[in-house]
């Protein structure tokens, strides 16, 4: 389906895109006139453009024009050398001739070689009425459609702008959070050094405790030895006491005699 655009958009597209070919399309009206429109084909475009031209009388056969079947009761179309030329839109550039080469010569397709330079336009299957054309044009994009698209683009642009501001604010927040993380990292590093120093102190204290335990163990062994000696001395004292008691008894016996 060709895409319908405005004359202004067509002129802009003609300046920015390379035009490849065009053909004239006619639609039969009830008053015997044809509605002529030029269908342009552009390079690197996935659609064609129909540019409306003013109403023209019935057109006979020509290189780029095909004559359709006559409607019953309609006037006969002239068929002869005196063919009226197609009316041209003043804003529409003439694309029937290609760009001139160096030296002022035209591309092939001039009067010396009429069989070259133009692509043959296929004959339309049938002519359509105004109503049928309007039904088909409903599928084409209109100025209102372009306006809606422009509005959507404006909304998307504003949305992207707002999102860009939000991303900028979030970037500042992330940057501030990064600084906080760096400060926390330094604090954790200092605390780690302190914990490491405390660990060294605890390790030294543990070594001291081990040495004290060893000394306590040695003192315990000495205490045990002293207890054994005290026990032995106690037994010796008991023997001495018993000996003294026996000696006292003997003395008493001797005195009584």
From Swiss-Prot:
Residues 80-104, 115-132 have a biased composition (Basic and acidic residues). It comes from the Bacteria. It holds the Pfam family DUF16. InterPro entries: DUF16. Belongs to the UPF0134 family. Residues 49-132 are annotated as: Disordered. It comes from Mycoplasma pneumoniae (strain ATCC 29342 / M129 / Subtype 1) (Mycoplasmoides pneumoniae). This is UPF0134 protein MPN_013.
């Amino acid at each position: 389906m060709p895409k319908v655009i405005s004359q202004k958009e067509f002129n802009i597209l003609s300046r920015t895109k390379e035009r490849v070919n065009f053909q004239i399309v006619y639609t039969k009206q009830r008053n015997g006139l044809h509605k002529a429109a030029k269908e342009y084909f552009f390079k690197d475009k996935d659609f064609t453009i129909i540019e409306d031209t003013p109403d023209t009388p019935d057109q006979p056969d020509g290189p780029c024009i095909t004559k359709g079947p006559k409607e019953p009761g309609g006037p006969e179309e002239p068929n002869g050398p005196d063919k009226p030329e197609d009316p041209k839109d003043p804003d529409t550039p003439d694309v029937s001739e290609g760009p001139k080469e160096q030296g002022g010569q035209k591309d092939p397709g001039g009067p010396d070689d009429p069989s070259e330079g133009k692509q043959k336009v296929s004959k339309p299957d049938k002519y359509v009425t105004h109503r049928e054309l309007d039904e088909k044009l409903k599928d084409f994009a209109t100025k209102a459609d372009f306006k809606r698209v422009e509005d959507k683009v404006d909304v998307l642009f504003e949305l992207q702008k707002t999102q860009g501001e939000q991303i900028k604010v979030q970037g500042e927040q992330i940057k501030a959070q990064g600084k906080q993380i760096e400060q926390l990292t330094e604090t954790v590093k200092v605390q780690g050094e302190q914990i490491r120093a405390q660990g060294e102190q605890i390790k030294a204290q543990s070594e001291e405790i081990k040495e004290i335990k060893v000394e306590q163990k040695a003192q315990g062994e000495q205490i045990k030895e002293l207890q054994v000696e005290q026990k032995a001395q106690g037994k010796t004292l008991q023997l001495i006491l018993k000996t003294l008691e026996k000696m006292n008894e003997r003395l008493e016996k001797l005195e009584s005699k």
